[in-house]
């Protein structure tokens, strides 16, 4: 399987969000949370109401501390205003679910989160409806690789474009080199070239 890509265009992000919002607040929050906190999908899907909201008011927390499934390391991430608003919408639309309820609740079983495969289909189908992903009549991919890892890579790509240092992103992603991080967040040679061509100082 080819490596998935970040979503580089902010208009596409808005269009993806609109499609997912039309489906459910769950799907919209999955997307918005994923592109704003940079967690792996395995860590996103295990989140419960008690992880994202305050015990006394059920208002969104300012930050969350989790143990990453892959690394077993403790990770602290902060919740910005856009994500907080989505959490509030989610709580309202879902009649204030209990604290032990999974945020990304499956319709199958009792209090079970959606699977990675379900999350992939949610994101990939939205991308396909926008023409980002195209398949032939046999269902094989023609172009576009969008999946759950796209969310994390989109966070990294736009953080870098907005001035976050490469060293900080390396730390956030637990990478061992700058080259690894640049490749991971989808900074291509063509984009590196643009940096120089757009620099016309003096």
Protein language model features and the residues they cover:
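Catalytic-site neighborhood detector that most strongly recognizes the C-terminal catalytic loop/helix
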Residues: 68, 173-198
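C-terminal catalytic core of Y-nucleophile DNA break-rejoin enzymes
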Residues: 69-88, 100-125
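Basic, Lys/Arg- and aromatic-enriched nucleic-acid-binding interface segment
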Residues: 10-41
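A short, basic/aromatic helix-end/turn motif that makes direct DNA contacts
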Residues: 46-53, 170-176, 185-186
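Conserved tyrosine-mediated DNA breakage-rejoining catalytic core shared by Y-recombinases
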Residues: 46-74, 78-83
């Amino acid at each position: 399987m080819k490596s998935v890509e970040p979503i580089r265009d902010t208009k596409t992000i808005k269009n993806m969000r609109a499609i997912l919002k039309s489906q459910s607040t769950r799907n919209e929050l999955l997307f918005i949370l994923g592109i704003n906190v940079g967690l792996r999908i395995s860590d996103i899907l295990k989140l419960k109401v008690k992880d994202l909201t305050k015990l006394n008011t059920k208002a969104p927390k300012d930050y969350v501390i989790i143990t990453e499934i892959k690394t077993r390391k403790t990770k602290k991430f902060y919740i910005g205003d856009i994500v907080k608003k989505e959490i509030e919408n989610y709580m309202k639309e879902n009649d204030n679910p209990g604290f032990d309820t999974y945020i990304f609740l499956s319709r199958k079983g009792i209090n079970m989160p959606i699977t990675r495969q379900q999350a992939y289909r949610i994101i990939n189908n939205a991308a396909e409806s926008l023409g980002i992903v195209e398949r032939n009549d046999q269902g094989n991919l023609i172009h576009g690789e969008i999946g759950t890892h796209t969310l994390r890579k989109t966070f990294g790509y736009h953080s870098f474009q907005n001035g976050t240092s490469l060293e900080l992103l390396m730390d956030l992603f637990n990478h061992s080199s700058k080259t690894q991080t640049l490749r991971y967040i989808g900074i291509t040679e063509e984009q590196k070239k643009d940096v120089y061509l757009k620099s016309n100082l003096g």
